[in-house]
């Protein structure tokens, strides 16, 4: 069940007064990083309620699970449930400045003809704009997007496959041979392979099968680097306030490339099932089901290229500037989609 559905289903009865107080508590915690009491709520947020009334409202919010006391203060901070309600119902996305718009445009105003370059730029840009870890993920490869394959003869026992996708992604794979092969045999093999691709008889996930099923020489197919790439920029920024053990766990998780890909693919599938029309999504670490990421949040947008979907976004501490971050990602996402659409049109003109 998504966070949106879960929250809305559990607290349909929250009053406007409770919303007002909850919004102030979460905003204060995100901004200051500290608990807040009834007097501060009245002074800082101009809430026209008595301190006694606010204390009663806070007690009700605590009973409902939206806020909690800390061990060191009588003030309150939001729980994960409070965060989720704030993000889905109360948060107003901040508009980005004209200077930020111009800075983003300057990054994307140069002609780019490969998705990989767009994603590299985007990962770096998002990390600079937000000071969080910028993330950009290619779409999961499907079985209908191979344009052609080139085989490069390295030596008698090694051939490199260069796989060109319809969206201009270029992948490489090393093919290890059981016994010697000549350049002429490699040329013959690439002709056979591309003929099958043109006839839709073989796709990206079948290339290994093509080699291993033939009476040929191939006995090993490297797959250390899966065909879906992702780019993470400024990962240390999200680890500043964590202890050494937690930092080690997070770094080890991000080093497991398969786990990372599965996480992002899961998010894409989840949004597809929800049929979400939101441009920017937020998921808290506890919703990811990954222990190493429980104290973090992921703010992201999904882009589309040729019917396949990928992700751009940032990962940072749970106490992050959501309003500003969501505004930035929303604008960057629009720029990325415009650039991809332009790239696709140029490609179609050449067909």
Curated annotation (Swiss-Prot):
The keyword Disulfide bond does not apply. GO terms for molecular function: DNA binding. GO terms for biological process: negative regulation of DNA-templated transcription. It comes from the Bacteria. Pfam families: HrcA (PF01628). The keyword Amino-acid biosynthesis does not apply. Keywords: Repressor, Stress response, Transcription, Transcription regulation. Belongs to the HrcA family. Negative regulator of class I heat shock genes (grpE-dnaK-dnaJ and groELS operons). Prevents heat-shock induction of these operons. This is Heat-inducible transcription repressor HrcA. The lineage of its organism: Bacteria, Fusobacteriati, Fusobacteriota, Fusobacteriia, Fusobacteriales.
């Amino acid at each position: 069940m998504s966070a949106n559905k879960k929250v809305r289903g559990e607290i349909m009865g929250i009053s406007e007064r409770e919303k007002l107080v909850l919004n102030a508590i979460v905003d204060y915690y995100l901004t200051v990083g500290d608990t807040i009491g009834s007097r501060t709520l009245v002074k800082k947020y101009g809430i026209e309620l008595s301190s006694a009334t606010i204390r009663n409202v806070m007690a009700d919010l605590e009973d409902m699970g939206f806020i909690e006391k800390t061990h060191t203060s009588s003030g309150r901070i939001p729980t994960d449930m409070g965060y989720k309600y704030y993000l889905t119902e109360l948060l107003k996305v901040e508009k980005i400045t004209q200077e930020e718009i111009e800075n983003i445009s300057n990054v994307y105003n140069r002609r780019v003809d490969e998705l990989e370059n767009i994603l590299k730029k985007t990962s770096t840009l998002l990390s600079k704009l937000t000071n969080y870890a910028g993330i950009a993920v290619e779409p999961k490869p499907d079985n209908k997007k191979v344009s052609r394959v080139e085989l490069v003869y390295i030596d008698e026992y090694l051939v490199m496959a260069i796989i060109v996708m319809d969206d201009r992604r270029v992948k490489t794979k090393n093919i290890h041979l059981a016994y010697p092969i000549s350049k002429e045999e490699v040329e013959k093999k690439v002709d056979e392979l591309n003929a099958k691709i043109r006839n839709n008889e073989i796709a990206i996930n079948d290339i290994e099968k093509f080699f291993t099923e033939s009476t040929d020489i191939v006995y090993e197919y490297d797959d250390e680097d899966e065909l879906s790439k992702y780019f993470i920029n400024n990962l240390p920024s999200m680890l500043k306030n964590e202890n050494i053990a937690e930092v080690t766990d997070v770094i080890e998780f991000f080093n497991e490339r398969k786990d990372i890909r599965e996480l992002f693919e899961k998010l894409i599938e989840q949004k597809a099932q929800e049929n979400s029309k939101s441009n920017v999504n937020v998921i808290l670490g506890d919703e990811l089901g990954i222990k190493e990421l429980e104290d973090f949040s992921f703010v992201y947008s999904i882009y589309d290229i040729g019917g396949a979907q990928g992700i751009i976004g940032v990962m940072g501490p749970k106490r992050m500037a959501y309003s500003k971050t969501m505004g930035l990602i929303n604008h960057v996402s629009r720029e990325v989609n415009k650039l991809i659409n332009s790239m696709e049109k140029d490609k179609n003109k050449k067909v």
